[in-house]
Amino acid sequence: MPNPEASLSPRSARYPKASMHVVPMLAPNDTAAFRALFASGAVDPASVVALIAKSEGSGLHNDHARVFADVSLRTALAEARGCPVEDLADSVTVAVSGGSPGVISPHVTVVTQEWVADLPAGLPGVGLVVGRGHTEPILPEDIGRTAQVDKVADAVAAAMLDAGVTDPDDVHLVMVKGPALSSRAVADALSRGKTVVTGDYGIGPMGSMCWSNDASALGVAVALGEVKRDLVADDRIRSDWDLFSAVAATSSGGEKRGGEVLLLANSAQSASELRIGHGITRDMADTEGIKTAIRTAGVDFDCCLSPAQQAQVVQVFGKFVLPGSDVLRGQHITALDDHEAHHVAKAVGGALVVSITGQPMSFISGGERNSHMGPPGGNPVAAVVRRLPA
């Protein structure tokens, strides 16, 4: 049952308590396990602040399976709360990533946050906190340009404030779901005498999804001080790969009109039983970056996780992109020539993560060629684990 002493208002309690539940989705409209969290009393629907899901589908700008999953989850939560779906926009961030190739199992990660009177006894150190933000409307002509960078940076700053975090080093993951171009969006821009960054709506090297994702990533980098704002210009987006964020995981879809931001950080003022850490893989074959994320979250291990340590891992969030080069550790690879190369990147990332954690319900996004998410060839990974008593 929900904690009767927990409050959703910080006015009556001091400490935020964030939690996560990961449940399966057997189809884009399958919300049975999600609804069961409410029916069993495991989750108070009023405490939900974010839904982060992986759906089956193409993962492209017009992935209707992703949209179907998004609508299904919103509808289920609204019914549990007894409110119109439209009322969720101001209180819940919904980010659904399409495409679950390889070992990735479709699922939803339910993020909750309540307010409690006391910090947990026996759990030393810092715990997870959650912050949310929304951008101003991102117009079609903004996508992939500095206008989007600035709007996302402002929303990330708001999310930090919402989380009660002042030090960017405490931030380990910033997820942004933004808009991508569509034929309708392009027509709208042209009708107003504006231009757009590309005529490709997809996820290829010139695809609008890549432009949007990378502008959002640079917005994260600017907000966190990873990149100075005066270094970012339109002609450096998707060009200067030395500009990047180590904690951004961004995605986009043609159905969006603005950006939703979810920030996960650690704080000594957190009552959460969870903690987050992050790492960066050095290439498509590297597992050390994943292990670093788990270790920095608080799990101490040598080469492999024990079964008990695997159970301590609540969720892994990974952004796996395609490298700009067709050479991996001195050898030629053909991933860049694959007609569904974006699925290859996700499948490889999923295999790496699941081989370590043993959990197919991991959030693996990606598929872009080159990215401002992580350094050239690298991929940002974040891990949320359960804190153990001292």
From Swiss-Prot:
Region (RU A): 1-118
Region entry RU C, spans: 274-390
Domain of life per record: Bacteria
Keyword Ribosomal protein among record annotations: no
InterPro entries assigned: AtzD/Barbiturase, AtzD/Barbiturase_RUA, AtzD/Barbiturase_RUB, AtzD/Barbiturase_RUC
Renumbered residue ranges of the record's region RU B: 127-268
Keywords for this protein: Disulfide bond, Hydrolase
EC class: hydrolase
Active site feature: 177, 251 (nucleophile)
Residues at which substrate binds: 66, 97-98, 213, 251-252, 346, 365-366
EC number: 3.5.2.-
One MF term in the entry's GO annotations: hydrolase activity, acting on carbon-nitrogen (but not peptide) bonds, in cyclic amides
Domains (record comment): The monomer structure is formed from three repeating units (RUs) that share the same structure as one another. The monomer and the active site possess nearly threefold rotational symmetry, to the extent that the active site possesses three potential Ser-Lys catalytic dyads, but one of the 3 active site surfaces varies in composition suggesting it is involved in conferring substrate specificity.
Function: Cyclic amide hydrolase of unknown substrate specificity. Catalyzes the hydrolytic ring-opening of a cyclic amide. Does not act on cyanuric acid nor barbituric acid.
Assembly: Homotetramer; disulfide-linked. The disulfide forms between 2 monomers in the tetramer, such that each tetramer contains 2 sets of vicinal disulfides.
UniProt miscellaneous comment: The structural metal found in both cyanuric acid hydrolase and barbiturase is absent in the Frankia CyAH.
Family: Belongs to the cyclic amide hydrolase (CyAH) family.
Descriptive protein name: Cyclic amide hydrolase
